[in-house]
């Protein structure tokens, strides 16, 4: 959260997220369940606390959980998960298919020339890929639940050659890019017939160290933004 101007960032790194914050039901005091992506996904989607030294999505026998994806599936929703990297990373493909998701899209689905590093494709490609898939689901007339896991603000950073950041450090340039890619996704989504009937929930899976570490587990590791946006809801904080 501390990369956003609303939470004290002196530079304007996230103009789109900052603007979306004021147009959403937004939460100032929201904290992640852990400090790794698997912690955030597990807690957010299935409402179980993270086990700090254990990845509960891994294992030869995949446990079944009740959570948002499974409850929605029981009520007629079609569930899709989009990630940038390989499906086997953190056992995500097998875990999510076992626990409520109908389709999982990962690096294996994307053109090889779009893979830029060990974390697969970049955010803007993931968003561009997702739009037509969501259009196909919307055309069926059935409700859908889609989870998009972005990755760009995670080292190793890759700044696309077509993106021109205003700052000079890779750590801030990648934040600018991630914000730009998200803006581009919303601009495209707004053109689709399902946009006005969709609730968008944006949150961080975990934080990162911003500034100096004042204690063993700095607040910035867990303090994350949460925004619930729809063209049909009134903003509040």
What are these regions (language model features)?
Residues 1-237:
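Solvent-exposed soluble domains appended to multi-pass membrane proteins
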């Amino acid at each position: 959260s501390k990369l956003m101007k609303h939470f004290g960032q002196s530079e304007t790194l996230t103009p789109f997220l900052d603007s979306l914050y004021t147009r959403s039901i937004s939460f100032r005091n929201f904290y992640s369940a852990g400090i790794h992506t698997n912690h955030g996904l597990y807690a957010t989607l299935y409402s179980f606390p993270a086990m700090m030294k254990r990845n509960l999505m891994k294992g030869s026998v995949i446990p079944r959980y009740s959570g948002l994806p499974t409850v929605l599936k029981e009520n007629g929703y079609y569930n899709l998960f989009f990630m940038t990297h390989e499906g086997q990373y953190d056992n995500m493909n097998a875990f999510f298919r076992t626990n409520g998701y109908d389709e999982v899209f990962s690096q294996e689905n994307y053109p090889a020339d779009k893979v830029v590093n060990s974390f697969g494709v970049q955010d803007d490609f993931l968003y561009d890929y997702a739009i037509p898939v969501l259009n196909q689901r919307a055309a069926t007339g059935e409700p859908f639940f889609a989870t998009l896991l972005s990755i760009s603000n995670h080292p190793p950073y890759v700044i696309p050659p077509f993106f021109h950041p205003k700052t000079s450090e890779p750590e801030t340039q990648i934040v600018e890019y991630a914000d730009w890619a998200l803006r581009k996704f919303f601009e495209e989504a707004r053109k689709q017939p399902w946009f006005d009937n969709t609730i968008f929930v944006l949150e961080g899976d975990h934080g990162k160290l911003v500034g100096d570490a004042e204690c063993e587990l700095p607040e910035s590791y867990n303090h994350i933004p949460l925004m619930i946006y729809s063209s049909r809801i009134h903003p509040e904080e």
